[in-house]
Amino acid sequence: MDDAAVLKRRGYLLGINLGEGSYAKVKSAYSERLKFNVAIKIIDRKKAPADFLEKFLPREIEILAMLNHCSIIKTYEIFETSHGKVYIVMELAVQGDLLELIKTRGALHEDEARKKFHQLSLAIKYCHDLDVVHRDLKCDNLLLDKDFNIKLSDFSFSKRCLRDDSGRMALSKTFCGSPAYAAPEVLQGIPYQPKVYDIWSLGVILYIMVCGSMPYDDSNIKKMLRIQKEHRVNFPRSKHLTGECKDLIYHMLQPDVNRRLHIDEILSHCWMQPKARGSPSVAINKEGESSRGTEPLWTPEPGSDKKSATKLEPEGEAQPQAQPETKPEGTAMQMSRQSEILGFPSKPSTMETEEGPPQQPPETRAQ
C-alpha cells in the first residue's frame, strides 16, 4: 500500500513534497480530523541505516511525544505500519524558516530579533528544564508560523540527558549538528556538556539574526576553531548594534564552557528585557526592582579592519558551501538544504567590522 493510501485511511489527504532523502521524506497533507494542513515525515525502516534506527529515531520519537510548547513545532500523531514505514504528523510552518527570511530580507532589526530570540530561548529553557537537549540548533531548524513566530523543529539529534548518582549531567560524545553552528569543544571531538553546546548555537543564531552573516567562516575548520578559542567575535559596523546585543552574543560565544552563559542567564540579560521607546536599557531582577544590566556595554576597538565572516544577506553573488552537514539522512526536510542555505558567500566578505571583547571584564553574568 502506498503512502497516499495509508494516509487516506488515517484521514490525511496527501499534498506536495516538502523534502526527500534516501530513506525519508516530508510531505504536506490535509487532516480531515483537524481541518487544516499538516506536515508528515515518512521514514522507511527498510532503507534506513542501523545506527539511525537503533539510536536516533527512538530518541526523536520519545522526545517529540513529550514536548508541548508554543514555540516548538507540535506533533499531532506518530504511527507505524507493518510494512516498516514510520509516519510523524506535525504542525506545518507556512512561512518557511528563519534562514529563508534572512536570506530574503537581510538582517533583522534588534527589536524583531529580540522577540524571535526570546521565543527561541523560552523553547530551549523548556527543553533544558526537562533535561532534553536539541544539539542541532540552526536557523533552518527555526520554522515560522503564519505570524512569523518561531517554531523550533527537527529533534533528530535530540536526547534526554542522563545524570550520575551524584546528579551531575553525563557528557555527550557524538558529533551533532552543522560545523558552522558547532561549539569548539564539539569540533575538537572531546566529550561535551550538551546543554552548554546548545547555548553556543544560540549565540551563532542571534549573530545571524542581527548581522545577516555567519560569525565564523567554516570553510577552514582548523582556522575557525583557532579564532573561536581566542574568543574573537567581529561585528559589522554598518549594523550599528547596541552594546547590550553584542555583549549577549559575546558571552554565548564563550569558548570556556565553565564561563558560557546558561539559558536562565540569557533570559535575564539586559538586552532580552522589553525596551521602552527612547529609554535606556533596564534589567528587571527577580524581586521586581529595575537596575542597570550587570553586563558591561560592548565597546568596539577603534580602527579595526577585520573582515566579517560568511555573509548571508542578499547583497552579493552566492558561492557554494564546501563543508558538508553531518545530520543523519533520516531528517529529510533539512537534509539537502545546507548547501542551499549556506550557498551565500562562504568566504569572508570585505566590510568594516568591530571586534570584541568588551574593554571591561567580559565575564560578569546577568543576574
UniProtKB/Swiss-Prot annotation:
Kinase activity is specifically inhibited by 2 classes of compounds: biphenyl compounds (1,1'-(biphenyl-4,4'-diyl)bis(2,2-dihydroxyethanone)) and 1,2,7-trialky-1H-imidazo[4,5-g]quinoxalin-6-one. Activated by phosphorylation on Thr-174 and potentially by autophosphorylation. Changing T174E: Constitutively active. One of its GO terms (molecular function) is magnesium ion binding. Its cofactor is Mg(2+). The active site is at D136. PROSITE patterns: PROTEIN_KINASE_ATP, PROTEIN_KINASE_DOM, PROTEIN_KINASE_ST. Autophosphorylated. Ubiquitinated; HSP90 activity negatively regulates ubiquitination and degradation. Residues 12-272 form the Protein kinase domain. GO terms for biological process: protein phosphorylation; spermatid development. The keyword Transferase applies. CDD domains: STKc_TSSK1_2-like. Keywords: ATP-binding, Cell projection, Cilium, Cytoplasm, Cytoplasmic vesicle, Developmental protein, Differentiation, Flagellum, Kinase, Magnesium, Metal-binding, Nucleotide-binding, Phosphoprotein, Serine/threonine-protein kinase, Spermatogenesis, Transferase, Ubl conjugation. It is found in: Cytoplasm; Cytoplasmic vesicle, Secretory vesicle, Acrosome; Cell projection, Cilium, Flagellum. The keyword Magnesium applies. Its EC number is 2.7.11.1. Testis-specific. Present in sperm (at protein level). It is an enzyme of class 2 (transferase). It comes from the Eukaryota. ATP binds at L18, G19, E20, G21, S22, Y23, A24, K25, V26, K41. The modification Phosphothreonine is found at T174. Residues 303-314 have a biased composition (Basic and acidic residues). It catalyses: L-seryl-[protein] + ATP = O-phospho-L-seryl-[protein] + ADP + H(+); L-threonyl-[protein] + ATP = O-phospho-L-threonyl-[protein] + ADP + H(+). Testis-specific serine/threonine-protein kinase required during spermatid development. Phosphorylates 'Ser-288' of TSKS. Involved in the late stages of spermatogenesis, during the reconstruction of the cytoplasm. During spermatogenesis, required for the transformation of a ring-shaped structure around the base of the flagellum originating from the chromatoid body. TSSK1B might be used as a target for male contraception or and intra-vaginal spermicides. Interacts with TSSK2. Interacts with HSP90; this interaction stabilizes TSSK1. This is Testis-specific serine/threonine-protein kinase 1. The lineage of its organism: Eukaryota, Metazoa, Chordata, Craniata, Vertebrata.
